[in-house]
Amino acid sequence: MFKVRVIPCLDVKDGRVVKGVNFVDLRDAGDPVEAAIAYDAAGADELCFLDITATHENRGIMLDVVRRTAEACFMPVTVGGGVRTVDDIKTLLRSGADKVSINSAAVARREFVKEAAEKFGDQCIVVAIDAKRVPGRDRWEIFTHGGRKGTGIDAIEFAQEVVSLGAGEILLTSMDRDGTRSGFDIPLTRAIADSVQVPVIASGGVGDLDHLVDGIREGHATAVLAASIFHFGEYTIREAKDHMVRAGLPMRLDP
């Protein structure tokens, strides 16, 4: 049986870890490399770096942060933000990233996903989907550019399409729940997870440890991502994993 993964997410803006509510109102949470080293020591299964300004403000990729993290950490690292070309992916992988997350560029040009998967293998290509519920309907729309730009694209159909093109994993964030601490958008998570044959990482809204369990058990995700509950010391990675084990979920526990 697969082991459920617990993945801290480090949103990085101007070289600092930040955490906000609904993609805005950002507050500082520390140095990204120091945070990565701490999470590695704490037993995180993976780490996700997202440069949340890279696409919006056309910034380059934070290669120095990636390089220093890869040198210091054993856990797999996924990096996203400002990834627009095959060369961007190559540079990140050479800098030490294990997987690369594509967001706005995949929406703008679906074939980019296919090109990336064919060149580097689907195991290292993650498509990040930021979705918001369409009012009054069981439908979710994709937003890009750090959640600033609506697309009119249906999230479920898009997920199925990018998986058919070679995406090896979906990183799914509910913009309605992001930073609210009210739990994952379970209907959205389940709808995406049940519609594709690749791992789905649930993201957006974790406020307590039960929410992590719900993402797997009710949302059918294969991994859960959280930020603020870990960044500000409310819970440790070990506490999260122990709680999930008590709930009957298969976890990797370090000695």
Curated annotation (Swiss-Prot):
E.C. number: 4.3.2.10
GO cellular component, one term: cytoplasm
Compartments, record wording: Cytoplasm
Enzyme active site: D11, D130
UniProt main location, coarse: cytoplasm
InterPro entries (UniProt xref): Aldolase_TIM (IPR013785), His_biosynth (IPR006062), HisF (IPR004651), IGPS_HisA/HisF (IPR050064), RibuloseP-bd_barrel (IPR011060)
Gene Ontology biological process terms, A to Z: L-histidine biosynthetic process
Recorded GO MF terms: imidazoleglycerol-phosphate synthase activity; lyase activity
Catalytic activity, as annotated: 5-[(5-phospho-1-deoxy-D-ribulos-1-ylimino)methylamino]-1-(5-phospho-beta-D-ribosyl)imidazole-4-carboxamide + L-glutamine = D-erythro-1-(imidazol-4-yl)glycerol 3-phosphate + 5-amino-1-(5-phospho-beta-D-ribosyl)imidazole-4-carboxamide + L-glutamate + H(+)
Gene3D superfamilies the record matches: Aldolase class I
One Pfam family linked to the record: His_biosynth
Record pathway: Amino-acid biosynthesis; L-histidine biosynthesis; L-histidine from 5-phospho-alpha-D-ribose 1-diphosphate: step 5/9
Keywords on record: Amino-acid biosynthesis, Cytoplasm, Histidine biosynthesis, Lyase
Family under the similarity heading: Belongs to the HisA/HisF family.
Spans traversing the lipid bilayer: none
Function description: IGPS catalyzes the conversion of PRFAR and glutamine to IGP, AICAR and glutamate. The HisF subunit catalyzes the cyclization activity that produces IGP and AICAR from PRFAR using the ammonia provided by the HisH subunit.
Protein's UniProt name: Imidazole glycerol phosphate synthase subunit HisF
Keyword presence, Chloroplast: no
Subunit structure: Heterodimer of HisH and HisF.
Domain of life, per lineage: Bacteria
